[in-house]
Amino acid sequence: MKNNEKTDEDKLKDFKLMWSMGLGHSGKFFEGKNPIPKKTEIATKHTWKNIKNMPEQHVVVNLDMEISTEMIGTLKYGHIPEEMEDHWFMYCDEDTIRYYRSWTGFCIYECKFIKSGYNYKLTELTINRDPNQYGGKNIEADITLFMYLIISEVGGNDSKIFEKYLKILKEDDEKKKE
């Protein structure tokens, strides 16, 4: 097996995450196909009917993460849900990646990016903190979930980032019990 190939166990974990987080078309996953929508149309803010602006209740986190030009090229196509199971809509404008919950249109993440040599850098992540729109409260979990969405979108091996996300959530649950 090549280093970047996923094991059957990794594929099952991916399915569990995709099912719980609603990224992609789970029926395609069962058929052994890529659950992420095909990149045949470039998503824009006008592609999805009910998107809303980032609320005033939000936090901004500085990032310093380099991603390839190829990855940005894929991300610029956006993510247009094909089925109800897919809970995310995403589009990019000139310098921002924007993720929305597809059912409600609530903006959850906005990430600024800049050109950096031959690649790009993710520089600033804005995270929704309106409790009426989004229940996230842990910055580390939110950064990890955002990175999972990005890695999955470009077809990368997202198993390790998923494990990190689950670990953060488990630690949060344990702290609540104390």
For the regions a protein language model found, what residue spans apply to each?
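A structural signal for the main folded, soluble domain(s) of proteins
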Residues: E70, H79, C92-E94, G117-T123, ...
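Negatively charged, low-complexity tracts enriched in Asp/Glu with abundant Ser/Thr
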Residues: K11-T96
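Canonical SH2 domain fold
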Residues: M90, I97-K115, E124-L125
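Contiguous mid-protein beta-loop-alpha structural module that forms a pocket-lining wall or clamp
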Residues: K2-N3
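Intrinsically disordered, low-complexity segments enriched in small/polar residues
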Residues: L75, F89, I97-R101, Y118, ...
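Polybasic, proline/glycine-rich intrinsically disordered low-complexity segments
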Residues: N119-E178
